Amino acid sequence: MSVRALSHVAVGVRDMDRSLAFYRDVVGLAVTSDRVEEFAQGAEQAPAQRRAVYLRWGDGPHSSYVVLDQHLTKETQGAAIPLFDAGIHHFAFWVDDLDAALERARDAGFDVVLGGGRAVGSEWLGEPEGGRPVRSAMLRDPEGNHVQLDQRV
């Protein structure tokens, strides 16, 4: 068995419009589906409804997705995990133009936690020393999740 790609990351949201603006307009993901779905909550509970927006990056049969899930039957609970705590505390996307993405984020009022400073070596990617450096920035999405943007320089 081999892993071909990441299938999807599902993000529970309270404000779909604001979250959609972040992942579509700032990060640059493409909306492929926006629908209301019924889903099972467990054997003892009635089915519930959610609004699910699928945003794709990459092409081909192994594209990856962010799925924004908004519970429509009850109020969404929970909070984002602080950076570097146990659990998935951030995820990252490769972007073509980090400065443009940061400008879009700031213009839309999103929180830039660490902003695109100096480039660092790419050894952390398992590449040989002297590989193409990477610039990174850390943003917070509308739910408080940390989202990193990386650009090769």
What does each of the following model-derived ranges do?
Residues 2-7:
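Extreme N-terminal starter segment of soluble prokaryotic enzymes
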Residues 10, 30-41, 114-120, 126, ...:
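Conserved catalytic-core motifs of GNAT/GCN5-like acyltransferases
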Residues 55-60, 137-142, 152:
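Active-site beta-strand termini and strand-to-loop segments that position acidic
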